[in-house]
Amino acid sequence: MEYLSKVAKQHILRWIKCRKYFDEYPFSANFAKETHYFDMKTYWVDILTFFCVVILCLFAADVPVKGAIPQKYSVTYFSSQNGVEDGLVNDIIQDHKGLLWFATWNGLYRFDGYNFKNYKSNMEDLGGLTNDRLLDIVEDKFGCIWVLCYDSTCYRFNPDKEVFEPVIQKTANSFRSISVLPNGIVWLLREDGSAVRVVTAPEDLSMTFQFYSSRENTLSTGKIRSVFMDSKLREWLLTDEGVYRLYDSELSIISLSDCRKSEKIPFYFATELEEYIYLGAHQGKVYKYLLTGELSIHTQLPTSASVISILPSVAGLIYVTDSDGFFIHDSLGEIRHVMLDSLSLLKDKTIESAKITCGDLLWLVHPVPGVTLFDLKTQRLSFIEGKDELGRPLNTESDFFAFEDRNDILWVHPKGGGFSYFDSQNRRLIPFNTTEQPVKWKSNDRCFAAFVDKQGNLWMSTQLNRLKRITFIPDKFHIYTPTPQDVELPDNEIRSEERR
């Protein structure tokens, strides 16, 4: 704005000088020759240029700065007056219809943009929800909402019937996670390593349950850690004693090129990259399985740690281990080991999970509060902790999460607390909350959940304010300077152009 003001000032001063000469000399055909300064063409060009500058200020296009958070926003708080009895929200999703769903301590809420509707346990519904404390929710291909409760029970909410439908169980084992696959298959993983595979009929949404465990004789051995589906709709079951593949109702165990048949190898991670399935296993083993054949290629990393994540990046493939940092495998085949020994503030260097976000940022999550950041652009490794009003590390029972909104703003919540946005210019986290206090997160406050909807609104559930919606107001004026080093340069002047 400072540059545009200088441009306008220059033209105003020039116009005043021209007007002065115009008043001193009677107008004639020889006016320009007499003054050696001014002609009518220049006079009107300057007037038109000045008004163009004014119009540009008033009607500048709304072009947000990439990755920059708008300084202005409005906040809407939701409470019992809006139909939300308990605003402590553990999870938020937006379904394929655009409806928002909230997993709360008081059941499931649906928001249609105007009103909230609550669904919770009902004494008259004997087969329905029995615990109103919901932890996680996820939508399947058919629009049903799967719910994991605080007591480790699991239900499917049918939006058409508006009822909770229980999962049939043969045992009372607790569920630990829900895995929804792209083809509509849902896997419910139990704490004991067994699993329930749920097949939904598209015509009436009826469910068929299939049970997988060594106890059911559907697995020869092993406890299921995770489930993955490849692009050919084959399901991979990763266990602590090998890996299985399920296709066309046929379950087979995958043989590995470097292993004896009697050897039991724990597997931790699977992903598809180009024409390969990558599998992370124990003792630094990485397997590449061709989608078109049965060949597996074995890569041995120089570590005895387990490979728990395999992530593509601009630097190459990143192999994250559980106890020995991570490895970068570049396009030339070179493998570089990055250890965490330099992080003196990190008390436990065990890695639980990893995530790569925009800006080439690798985030590592540990058993202790905080998060480790490796910047692939600057090659800088740092450990980040949220701090309270006394400068102490935040230590709330809240997990790490990160997501990017439609304005390219990266939102990050370190484990333990301190919801922030990433400052891409200075490569650091800036704490964010709607409070006007300089310390955004105090010891008596925490962020339970955060989510950005398709309209660009940021939803937050916090200890003090409960559920709130933040609507950012974009800046209307943005200045483009061709040569920012010196605003006085001719390249930066705004002039009107006469076309003949």
Residues covered by each model-derived region:
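Basic, amphipathic alpha-helical segments enriched in Lys/Arg and hydrophobic/aromatic residues
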Residues: 2-25
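Carboxylate-rich, polar loop motifs that coordinate divalent cations or form catalytic acidic clusters
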Residues: 27-500
